[in-house]
Amino acid sequence: MRHKIKGRKLNVTSSHRQAMLANMVVALVTHEQIKTTLPKAKELRPYIETLITKAKKADLTVRRSVLSKIKDKKAVEKLINILGTRYKDRPGGYTRIIKAGFRYGDLAPIAYIEFVDRDINAKGNIQQDANEEIKN
């Protein structure tokens, strides 16, 4: 019985799952929007939300704690300096998940996960990306 067991397995080992989530956090912090499968996006959301909540405090212990979760120093700097100050007055709900149909080949549900009030120049506009995919 799977009672009271949190999280999704995502059909990988625990070390693979931790590394995958850390890499997805780095990509999300860098580009402020990523395209992934829906279960991965749903698993990533609470992970990044806790990191941003910690980053709002912005002291040395927080920096070390976040650096132990994700190993990219540039991503940690952006998380604490830019995103932490951007969401300082917001009590939560820093990300949104937008469903984007199904992947061709295996019909896996695809979703965009992005920051609320994100910098559009960091990655691009979802509507433009969708229009380009339809044209191709």
UniProtKB/Swiss-Prot annotation:
PROSITE patterns: RIBOSOMAL_L17. The keyword Ribosomal protein applies. Signal peptide: none annotated. InterPro entries: Ribosomal_bL17, Ribosomal_bL17_CS, Ribosomal_bL17_sf. The keyword Ribonucleoprotein applies. It holds the Pfam family Ribosomal_L17. GO terms for cellular component: cytosolic large ribosomal subunit. Part of the 50S ribosomal subunit. Contacts protein L32. HAMAP family: Ribosomal_bL17. Belongs to the bacterial ribosomal protein bL17 family. This is Large ribosomal subunit protein bL17. It comes from Rickettsia massiliae (strain Mtu5).
